[in-house]
Amino acid sequence: MSKIIAINAGSSSLKFQLFEMPSETVLTKGLVERIGLEDSIFTITVDGEKQKEITNIPDHAVAVNMLLKKLTENGIVKSLDEIGGIGHRVVHGGEKFADSVLITDEVLADIEELSDLAPLHNPANVVGIKAFQEVLPNVPAVAVFDTAFHQTMPESAFLYSLPYEYYEKFGIRKYGFHGTSHKYVTERAAELLGRPIESLSLLSCHLGNGASIAAVEGGKSIDTSMGFTPLAGVTMGTRSGNLDPALIPYIMEKTGQTVEEVVNVLNKKSGMLGLTGYSSDLRDIIAKEEEGDHRAKVALDVFVSRIHKYIGSYTARMKGVDAIIFTAGVGENSAIIRERVLEGLEYMGVYFDAKRNNVFGEEAFISFPHSPVKIIVIPTDEEVMIARDVLRLGDIG
């Protein structure tokens, strides 16, 4: 048995989960928020109880030291020698990484170089890796990339209709994201269906504040809705999703904003927040719609219609699907959104059961037994996928 810690480092946060492997038992999990501020928040679960502490955590190195101290103080590990491996979520692996990889100096340099493609995420991921290297230099560490699962996409899916040299010189292409989540739920769907994943065509709908759809054929991603960045695809909480690229200079001209300012609007002030004017949270928007708010209704209609576009095109691409999977915050917990997405899909063999659909955050088949296309709710577990890859690549006994 080995203890493996899964890490997701953000610019001012550090999310962690400690597993006993290979049993995949969660020993503890927690979150460090507001790193760099005087009122940082450290939360850890001990024996099922959440412990919360507000203190000054100036940087990620201090956060890591505090985390490791808490593990020993609370008896979760007797000593740090029990930690056999560390798994780091890294947002962007470019074309360089089609799988998770053991972190070396060369790999770390490559991840830093890829920061051009993910300036909001990769630098924070690197900070997290370095912080652990300082404290646990001899413990194997593995990088698990959000983009890796989608590296199986064919050129017809990942190339943009731009001058080919842009791809050759600058790496401009579709990369896709949420790969670890899409991989987990499609593998789990195959288990639940009792069929080899190689025989299945699956649609994975990762619907949260960020959202993406993936077409997975034979266990391999063949297309996905996010693109060069996580801004592309369906309408999201605060992100616009796909739009006419000529809108960017037009908005700049009309508003006097810079490129950076417009891109910031597209990332942080658009999507459901932009359409409603008051919230990115679908729970708030559904409540407002029930009160008769027109913009809430329109926003929800836009959200669902964009998902329909991908379901239709990916079903055509795979010549039919065996199952549609719902995962992430909205996908796992919103029966209303699932119902609206599935309504009217009988033409493609979807027959969902409204009673079975009344589930929240748990695995369930929500289609009728006779439905040719199965509908499955599967809570995602990116952390356990990270731990599995550490076990696979870290040579951990």
Curated annotation (Swiss-Prot):
As its record notes, the protein acts as a catalyst of: acetate + ATP = acetyl phosphate + ADP
Chain residues that bind ATP: K15, H206, L207, G208, N209, G210, D281, L282, R283, G329, V330, G331, E332, N333
Enzyme Commission (EC) number: 2.7.2.1
Has UniProt tagged this entry with the keyword Lipoprotein? no
- What pathway is this protein said to act in by its record? Metabolic intermediate biosynthesis; acetyl-CoA biosynthesis; acetyl-CoA from acetate: step 1/2
Q: Which InterPro entries match?
A: Ac/propionate_kinase, Aliphatic_acid_kin_short-chain, Aliphatic_acid_kinase_CS, ATPase_NBD
Where this protein primarily resides, as one coarse class?
Answer: cytoplasm
> What GO terms are given for molecular function?
acetate kinase activity; ATP binding; magnesium ion binding
Gene field: ackA
| Names of required cofactors | Mg(2+); Mn(2+)
What is this protein's name?
Acetate kinase
The text of the family note is:
Belongs to the acetokinase family.
Cell location? Cytoplasm
Which catalytic residues are annotated? D146
Transmembrane regions? none
One Pfam family linked to the record:
Acetate_kinase
Keywords from the UniProt entry: ATP-binding, Cytoplasm, Kinase, Magnesium, Metal-binding, Nucleotide-binding, Transferase
